[in-house]
Amino acid sequence: MYEGIVQDLIDELGRLPGIGPKSAQRIAFHLLAADPVDVRRLATALTEVKDKVRFCRSCFNVAQSELCRICADPRRDQALICVVEEPKDVVAIERTREFRGRYHVLGGAINPIGGVGPDDLHIRELVARLADGTVTELILATDPNTEGEVTASYLARQIGPMGLRVTRLASGLPMGGDLEWADEVTLGRAFEGRRVVNA
């Protein structure tokens, strides 16, 4: 254990997700040895992100103004909404350059064991967005795990009666993966989500 502010820094760094005590200590000592200009730049970035970044009033993605850049873009297809759990999922989908619609970030997934129910997520706001009839398809892109599946099923039941097309991202085998290492659920989904191959 170190003295005073050094230990305080290690403790604060250790509170970050994925940073254990050893990593926190390494980062703290890296910062102590770093150029003061670099440390100030990091401190400024941390302060500014907390002061200036908010959540989009429409989709709950991260934004620096009332609307995120995606919701503010008139070229995006307003008839398609892709529902994701977290803002990082928006970034992952945007990297593919396959989706030209808009998003809705739930802020998590239904997890009764973790104490997260439907009322803890941005589901009411999603239903309100769908009410004007602009959206024709809702793509459920929650994580392919138990919580994501529960959330997708819940949303499909809630939104199905609205007459929208509700789809779920196909899940299956990763590129470069071996069949022998695939679990039964993944392999089963790969068969269910198979598509025609044109010769």
Swiss-Prot record:
- Zinc finger annotations (C4-type) as residue ranges: 56-71
Q: Name one GO molecular function term.
A: zinc ion binding
The family line of this record is: Belongs to the RecR family.
Q: Tell me a GO biological process for this protein.
A: DNA recombination
| InterPro entries associated with the record | DNA_Rcmb_RecR (IPR000093), Hlx-hairpin-Hlx_DNA-bd_motif (IPR003583), Rcmb_RecR (IPR023627), Rcmb_RecR_Znf (IPR015967), TOPRIM_dom (IPR006171), TOPRIM_RecR (IPR034137)
Residue ranges of every copy of the Toprim domain listed in the record:
79-174
What Gene3D superfamilies does the record point to? 3.30.60.80, 3.40.1360.10, 6.10.250.240, RecR Domain 1
Q: What is the protein's name according to its record?
A: Recombination protein RecR
- What HAMAP family does UniProt report for this protein, alphabetically? RecR (MF_00017)
State what this protein does. May play a role in DNA repair. It seems to be involved in an RecBC-independent recombinational process of DNA repair. It may act with RecF and RecO.
**Is Nucleus one of the keywords UniProt gives this record?**
no
Q: Which UniProt keywords apply?
A: DNA damage, DNA recombination, DNA repair, Metal-binding, Zinc, Zinc-finger
**NCBIfam families registered for this protein in UniProt:** recR
